[in-house]
A protein has these predicted regions:
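Active-site-proximal C-terminal subdomain of hydrolase catalytic domains
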Residues: 155-291
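Conserved histidines in hydrophobic membrane contexts and catalytic metal-binding motifs
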Residues: 373, 442, 514-516
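Preferential activation on post-signal-peptide N-terminal prodomains/segments
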Residues: 288-431, 456-473, 526-529, 534-540
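A domain-level signal for caspase-like cysteine endopeptidase catalytic cores
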Residues: 22-118, 149, 164, 168-179
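A short, glycine/acidic-enriched catalytic loop
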Residues: 114-142, 146-162
């Protein structure tokens, strides 16, 4: 009898222990997306996964790797905020559900309208105060590792206004340690409680954001093709316009290089965490800026025939193996893969180096990075005649203590990138390029050594035909016709130029486009009227 009771008690204890535990890690390379609005954001959430819109039409050439396990959640549902909530905070929380909960995969991506303390969830809104991510404790069963969000201001950080910048919360580096308020946003205060120790990072936009196929395409082009690490791929990918300042936040120890902000690839392992918060954001060089062109639209615009770029002569000494559309060098960078890869359908070239970071070393002067980048492209045979002066950016990490009431704010440079843009001359006027091609990009470690480099630059064979060009007024009116609530929007800026695609795209023609950036007239109504980016063909065909 005693043995029977003991057996029953042991079985009960075992059952309770198993029930109270959850899987240590999520499934490797598992990704789920959700949309908070059924406007273009439902397409964005699908494009992130497959490169298609919600109806299956191809729309983005780069997307989540094909080998990953993918799910687009909440399609056809309404009032989905409970799937973002943790039941340890609110009884309604269901973020641990295997079907619709966001706290289950390795990576979760959200696209929709937002504001500093909330974001839309298909009819209602989710508030940050009800969220906890990666908390695999008891029955919470949260195993998320990476949380990516494309919304306006949900990750707002720093002062509302910055000198010389007309957009709110565009300078996270000027954060002064104040509590979260409308005038000084504090991402540590709002997102700190959400970051349970196992979550590796959460990323979003400090400023206004636009989220569609162009943004998801650039994020995955950065990661899949250019070799950017996880945080860099998101931040650079979402920073397509001057008014968009993304950032990532994580917990970690004293040494910044030991944090997930240095994840070269996605992992389903938990974050070792630590007693510090770290954020990463992008900052422009003080000494360089993109070229400003005199905007004169010619009466006629050539359409050019493109062919793949020949392999640069200095790279012909390497041995390559071919697989599908790619050539991979047999030389490898330890822990990163082939030192060189070439896309055969475009001729795009990608080069890798070792990642180096010394927290105590002083970064170089900006002019030294520019000189090193120019020397590299010359030595590797990447130089072109029709090229802009480089625009320089730096990735910056900000660190504070999680425990001190008035923490010391410290900053570190993580790496720098120099970007050279292609140009075409028409009627003695310089026409710029837009898109993910027509670029030479050199990412350097702080000591000036190579981390990543790419040249996406198809060769122009000849002019295939010439068309009349649309005037600015014609293109603007076409763009405006796509906005229903015209009185709620204003034109913030616009550009035009020839559009070259990412390096893994088969592109045989080079055409010009107008790109119009519309922002809300009332900045306080961004959740109702988020930014709109509208692209219009510049040709009358």
């Amino acid at each position: 009898m005693k043995r029977s009771v003991l057996y029953i008690l042991c079985s009960l204890v075992t059952t309770l222990l198993v029930a109270s535990c959850c899987p240590k890690n999520p499934a490797p390379n598992s990704v789920k997306t959700a949309h908070g609005n059924t406007d273009w954001h439902i397409d964005t959430a699908e494009e992130f996964l497959t490169g298609n819109d919600i109806n299956g039409n191809p729309s983005a050439s780069n997307h989540c790797p094909d080998t990953w396990t993918k799910t687009h959640m909440h399609v056809g549902l309404t009032n989905t905020n409970t799937y973002y909530y943790d039941k340890g905070v609110t009884a309604a929380g269901q973020d641990n559900l295997s079907t619709n909960g966001i706290d289950k995969p390795m990576l979760f991506f959200y696209a929709g309208h937002g504001a500093p303390t909330l974001f839309n969830t298909l009819g209602n809104s989710a508030y940050l105060t009800n969220m906890r991510l990666g908390n695999c404790q008891g029955s919470n069963d949260g195993t998320l590792r990476y949380y990516w969000q494309c919304s306006c201001e949900v990750f707002a950080h720093g002062p509302k206004t910055c000198t010389g910048i007309p957009y709110d919360y565009a300078c996270p580096g000027d954060f002064d340690g104040s509590p979260d308020s409308d005038n000084m946003r504090n991402v540590y205060e709002r997102w700190g409680p959400i970051l349970n120790p196992a979550l590796r990072m959460a990323c979003g936009s400090s400023t206004l954001a636009y989220c569609h196929e162009g943004e998801t395409n650039k994020i995955w082009d950065n990661y899949n093709n250019k070799g950017y690490d996880v945080a860099d791929a998101f931040i650079d990918g979402l920073h397509r316009y001057t008014w968009n300042t993304p950032l990532c936040i994580t917990t970690g120890g004293l040494f910044v290089s030991g944090t997930p902000l240095f994840d070269n690839t996605f992992t389903n392992a938990p974050n070792p965490s630590g007693s510090y918060y770290h954020i990463q954001y992008l900052s422009n060089f003080a000494t360089t800026a993109p070229s400003i062109f005199e905007v004169i639209i010619p009466e006629f615009l050539p359409i050019y025939e493109l062919i793949p770029l020949p392999l640069p002569d200095p790279l012909r000494k390497y041995k390559f193996v071919e697989k599908d559309d790619w050539m991979y060098s047999t030389d490898e960078i330890k822990g990163r893969g082939p030192a060189i890869k070439v896309n055969r359908i475009s001729g795009a070239v990608y080069l890798l180096g070792e990642q180096r970071f010394d927290e105590k070393a002083k970064p170089l002067e900006e002019k030294e990075y520019i000189s090193l980048a120019e020397r590299f492209i010359e030595n590797q045979g990447l130089t072109e005649k029709d090229i802009s002066k480089p625009a320089g950016t730096r990735m910056v990490i900000q660190r504070i203590s999680r425990e001190e009431k008035q923490p010391d704010i410290q900053k570190f440079q993580k790496n720098v990138t120099l970007t050279f843009k292609r140009q075409i001359t028409l009627d003695s006027k310089t026409v710029p390029f837009v898109g993910e091609g027509g670029l030479i990009s050199i990412q350097l470690n702080n000591d000036g050594t190579l981390f990543n480099a790419s040249k996406v630059w198809r060769q122009i064979k000849e002019i295939s035909r010439t068309t009349r060009a649309k005037t600015y007024e014609q293109a603007y009116n076409e763009a405006l016709a796509q906005i229903k609530e015209r009185d709620a929007y204003k034109l913030a800026d616009w550009t035009w130029g020839y559009e070259e695609q990412a390096g893994n795209v088969r592109q045989t023609e080079l055409k010009a486009v107008f790109i119009f950036n519309f922002l809300p007239v009332d900045p306080e109504k961004i959740i109702d009227y988020p930014p709109r980016i509208i692209k219009i063909s510049a040709h009358i065909e």
